[in-house]
Amino acid sequence: MLILLPPSETKRPGGAGRPFDASGLALPALAPQRSAVVDALIALSADEDAAARVLKLGPKQRSEVAVNAALRDAPTMAAVDRYTGVLFDALDAASLPSASRRWLGAHVLVHSAPFGPVGALDPIPAYRLGAGTSLPGVPALRRVWAEAVSAALGDRDPRFVLDLRSEAYVALGPVPDGIPTRYVRVVSEATDGAVRALNHFNKHAKGALVRRLADERPRISSAAGFVRWADAAGLRVRESAVGELELFA
């Protein structure tokens, strides 16, 4: 099983790893796209006012421009440790034992806007760029990434993909049709039986799910296998629309 996660806007600063290496991350075929987007971000950062406008930064966020300017030289840390926010706080990868972290490294990709999907343990620098940003110097991010990411995922050829990304990041790299995939929607059930999508708790539930998977390290190779594991783990999951699963929180 391969799990696809969205990134987070908030990130830990610093790191102790070597600087960014476009071809040293998971899916190395994406190195040209990674380099193009990173170079465009660095070029944009030469004009702080323009960068703040494009990245929609407020006065207290302008330090993010300098973060982007240093992308090629900045220290790195594992992607799963770099990101903070609701999903990654619930996952709390730093507190996992080594075997669970290795499981994350083997089974989880985090889909970023500047680097595309990267392995959970891949070293990445801090950055500021969202999926919907129109970045000068390169085509729309969807044009940069979608076809290339789909091809790279196809080359990896996982037996089953559990897609926990937001729809904005799905658009930057749809899973190829030939790969069995389930897109997960987090929902709740009201007392009247109505099922409603969740927002804030959506992220928490996804992070907690991945932590549970990393703790137990199951061998899952199909949607049916995932549903069986979830049922045994006391989680409520059901097939909904074609290609989708509902996770009840």
PLM segments and residue spans:
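N-terminal "assembly arms/tails" that initiate or stabilize quaternary assembly
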Residues: 1-62
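A glycine-rich, hydrophobic loop/mini-helix early in the fold
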Residues: 52-126
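Generic signal for short, ordered secondary-structure residues
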Residues: 16, 67-70, 90, 188, ...
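Internal, well-folded beta-alpha domain core
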Residues: 93-249
